[in-house]
């Protein structure tokens, strides 16, 4: 019996960062890919889902991939908690060839395709591995060939090698933040992770999305200092809270002038990103420097 042995994937070390090179066969080459990061609870899933709808309203074929073990990224699109990739794989003892696309892909509002990667039980395994397996599974079933836009909605502000794995696939990383100390502090750490990964991967920072904030003065001041730009601003509105409780995207809510301003902003954001947002060559601050920089006495 002949046993085929694949050459190991090379490991690169850059400035103390141990990084596994992406197998060329796993690259997403047929779509524009965005990875959405931000502090935990900042509204990344809300932002990702409404951005996905905005892309779909531009006539684009959209796939949203939730990268959180809670698997709650896409429920406003699908109106339910979708089955996870890891659960689907476990059901067939990890024989992926036995799965059908409908076992792990759910079509949501306005035709947005939704996938929840899921993750290992708490305290075990690596979530980044699950993200990698999700992309491989999508490729095996040729589900990326008819896709124009992929949106990765990534867990919290975790920037370990595992949950930084969507950066291997992304063209642009987007950071969702609020106009407060904790959100901007988390954003700086994410900038540092992306700055490190961009040495080996093609990902670049696309910009910042201000969320749940009446003002953006601290965000804008930080952006100017490190080399970022604000792409959109979504204030803290009750209609957003109600849309989550209704398990709906903002585009499905009862029309109002306030809501129209928000959905118009999402449409403008989608148009900007589709046209090709120039990369931000941001350089993160050191933690202590940022501590002194933010806020006022």
Swiss-Prot record:
GO aspect biological process, one term: photosynthesis, dark reaction
Residues engaged in binding [4Fe-4S] cluster: 126, 160
Pathway linked to the protein: Porphyrin-containing compound metabolism; bacteriochlorophyll biosynthesis (light-independent)
Residues that coordinate or bind Mg(2+): 45
Keyword rRNA-binding: no
Keywords: 4Fe-4S, ATP-binding, Bacteriochlorophyll biosynthesis, Chlorophyll biosynthesis, Iron, Iron-sulfur, Magnesium, Metal-binding, Nucleotide-binding, Oxidoreductase, Photosynthesis
Reaction catalysed by this enzyme: chlorophyllide a + oxidized 2[4Fe-4S]-[ferredoxin] + 2 ADP + 2 phosphate = protochlorophyllide a + reduced 2[4Fe-4S]-[ferredoxin] + 2 ATP + 2 H2O
Binding site for ATP: 41-46, 70, 211-212, 235-237
Top-level enzyme category: oxidoreductase
Disulfide feature: none
Pfam families with a match to the protein in the record: Fer4_NifH
Lineage: superkingdom: Bacteria
Cofactor remark: Binds 1 [4Fe-4S] cluster per dimer.
SUPFAM superfamilies given in the database record: P-loop containing nucleoside triphosphate hydrolases
Cofactor: [4Fe-4S] cluster
Function noted in UniProt: Component of the dark-operative protochlorophyllide reductase (DPOR) that uses Mg-ATP and reduced ferredoxin to reduce ring D of protochlorophyllide (Pchlide) to form chlorophyllide a (Chlide). This reaction is light-independent. The L component serves as a unique electron donor to the NB-component of the complex, and binds Mg-ATP.
Family classification: Belongs to the NifH/BchL/ChlL family.
PANTHER family on file: LIGHT-INDEPENDENT PROTOCHLOROPHYLLIDE REDUCTASE IRON-SULFUR ATP-BINDING PROTEIN
Subunit structure: Homodimer. Protochlorophyllide reductase is composed of three subunits; BchL, BchN and BchB.
Name of the protein in its database record: Light-independent protochlorophyllide reductase iron-sulfur ATP-binding protein
UniProt source species: Methylorubrum populi (strain ATCC BAA-705 / NCIMB 13946 / BJ001)
Gene coding for it: bchL
């Amino acid at each position: 019996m002949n046993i085929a042995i694949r050459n190991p994937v090379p490991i690169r070390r850059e400035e103390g960062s141990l990084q596994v090179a992406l197998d060329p066969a796993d690259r997403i080459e047929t779509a524009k890919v965005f990875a959405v990061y931000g502090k935990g609870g900042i509204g990344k899933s809300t932002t990702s889902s409404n951005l996905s709808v905005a892309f779909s309203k531009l006539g684009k074929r959209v796939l949203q991939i939730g990268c959180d073990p809670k698997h709650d990224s896409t429920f406003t699109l699908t109106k339910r908690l979708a089955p996870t990739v890891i659960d689907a794989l476990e059901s067939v003892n990890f024989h992926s060839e036995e799965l059908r696309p409908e076992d792990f892909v759910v079509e949501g509002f306005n035709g947005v395709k939704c996938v929840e990667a899921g993750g290992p039980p708490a305290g075990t395994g690596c979530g980044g591995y699950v993200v990698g397996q999700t992309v491989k599974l999508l490729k095996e079933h040729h589900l990326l060939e008819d896709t124009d836009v992929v949106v990765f909605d990534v867990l919290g502000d975790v920037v370990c090698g595992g949950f930084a794995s969507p950066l291997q696939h992304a063209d642009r990383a987007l950071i969702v933040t609020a106009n407060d100390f904790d959100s901007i502090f988390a954003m700086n750490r994410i900038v540092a992770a992306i700055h490190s990964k961009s040495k080996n991967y093609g990902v670049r920072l696309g910009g910042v999305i201000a969320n749940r904030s009446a003002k953006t003065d601290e965000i804008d001041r930080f952006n100017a200092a490190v080399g970022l730009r604000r792409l959109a601003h979504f204030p803290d509105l009750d209609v957003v809270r109600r849309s989550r409780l209704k398990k709906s995207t903002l585009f499905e809510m009862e029309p109002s002038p306030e809501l129209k301003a928000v959905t118009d902003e999402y449409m403008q954001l989608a148009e900007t990103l589709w046209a090709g947002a120039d990369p931000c060559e941001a350089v993160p601050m050191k933690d202590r420097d940022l501590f002194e920089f933010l806020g006022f006495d």
